[in-house]
Amino acid sequence: MFLKSNSSCLMSNFPADILIIDDERQIRRLLNLTLTGAGYHVRECENGQLGLSETALKRPDAIILDLGLPDINGLEVLKQLREWTQVPILILTAWDREDEKVD
């Protein structure tokens, strides 16, 4: 499975690069196994600062972002990313309390 490039309607011959930013090792591992099994290239970061740095170093085709990160809140990471990139971001979180939900 490949993502279409934002700059072209043509499919790339290279697998899409997905960056997972999540502090839970087991979740990163599960996502990595699932996505690599589907043909994607996957990179992992265990906190928000590493995720921001990794995105700046080599911009991924898409990001899977946890909101409950230990160093920087995931919403802050999202805000910072949106200041300089429009990369697609999927929010993945285990938040379940009503006051923690994103509108």
Short names for language-model regions:
Residues 1-19:
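Non-catalytic signal-transmission and effector/linker regions of two-component phosphorelay proteins
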Residues 28, 70, 97:
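The feature encodes the CheY-like receiver
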Residues 29-37:
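Charged docking surfaces used in two-component/phosphorelay signaling
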Residues 39-46, 54:
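Short hydrophobic/Thr-rich beta-strand motif most characteristic of the beta2 strand and flanking loop
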Residues 47-50, 73-76:
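Acidic catalytic/metal-coordinating carboxylates
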Residues 53, 76, 83, 96-103:
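Alpha4 helix (beta4-alpha4-beta5 surface) of REC/receiver domains from two-component response regulators
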Residues 58-64, 69:
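Active-site beta3 strand of CheY-like receiver
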